Amino acid sequence: TAVVVPFVMIVLFTIGVIVAAQKRNYEEMVQDVSLKQLGSLTNNVTLELRNFLEAPFQINQILSHGISYHQLYPSADLSAVENYLRSSFTRIYQPLQQIDVISFGSEGAEYVGIRKEPNQKYALMVKDARTAQVLTIYQSDRISDDVRSSIADYNPKLRPWYTPIVANPEPAWSPIYANVDEKQEVTLSALAPVMDGSQLLGVMVTDVKINTFNAFLRRLHRNTTALVYLTDNQQRLIASSSKSSIVSWGTEQTQAGERLLATESINPVIAAGSEYARQHQLTQNKSTQHFSFAQDGDRYFSLLTPYHDPHGLQWYIGVIIAETDLLGTLPQKQEKSWLLGIGVSVIGILLGLVAFNRIMAPITTTANTARRIAQGDWDSQLPKPGQIYET
């Protein structure tokens, strides 16, 4: 016992140190690999998002300058602005899939807009003297008897894309809001004032169709298996690689028609990652946060990165990837190698104990016999003779 117990303890301690060192090295490796992979995906999303948003913003400023420079808004009749927007949209900016509507709202509460339709056609929306100050949406891009819908008492000056420019007449982004047309889609608008000297004439608006960015995120998910989502500074979803809608049907925290909180996402992994970020207040640091969490027995790594642009957007880009997707079968192989190592060590201990017993048996027998003889037991049986080999 005096020899065997220390031997076993030393072997077990050595095994524990080796396993702990391997586990630590694995954790350092997986953290490093996940950070690099998630960082690369985040950079890709950031670049695509910047290009996605910058083009509509620049176009909106060009259109605003054109209306002001050519003095297209002299009266309550917006036909000149209508023709300018129609020709610009259909001839120049039609390839930009993210642009949904370009429109103009005036200080006189008139409104004109051209909306892109799914069939590659356009719909005209007008509220001016020609429509008796009723917002009228036509089936085509011209005023006709073919009316799709009408909205009475529509005042563009009360819309969330108009009031920010009144408060600060500088190009900016609107809050994310729902349109009041028959589609009521979630929209982000690029805003620019139309000025006559220092006088505000109206607001030029270019609506960005956010669900077109969802298409990019879903392609990214198919190619990498990573989940990607965008949230605003209130952690409400803006876009997601998940196919589920970001609009609520009514929950405890979100009214029907509003955007869901990220923690309410239909996708359980996005919801779990967002809940972890909320509980640990990761968005309060205003810096990139790398973390891992568990969901349904699987481990996931996530990178939460702030996104800012010069025009007022304060969003977050969340990227999530599963450990199995990140490293393939390496975790399973690592676990098998640990089990194999432990098994080999146990066999080694057992073989060592057998060897020790074979070596120590004659010694302990001789010692016990000598002790009994010393105590006067002359009938003690002597151990069997053996041979000693010099090595």
Segments from the language model and where they lie:
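Juxtamembrane extracytoplasmic/periplasmic/luminal helical "stalk" adjacent to the first N-terminal
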Residues: 3-4, 10-98, 171, 186-187
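Membrane-interface helix-start motif
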Residues: 28, 213-219, 321-341
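Short N-terminal helix-loop-first-beta-strand/juxtamembrane motif that initiates sensory/input modules
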Residues: 58-61, 92-110, 117-141, 167-173, ...
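Extracytoplasmic/periplasmic ligand-binding sensor regions of membrane-associated signaling proteins
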Residues: 127-213
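Intrinsic low-complexity, intrinsically disordered coil/linker regions enriched in small/polar
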Residues: 146, 153, 157-158, 197, ...
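Membrane-proximal alpha-helical signal-transduction linkers
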Residues: 358-386
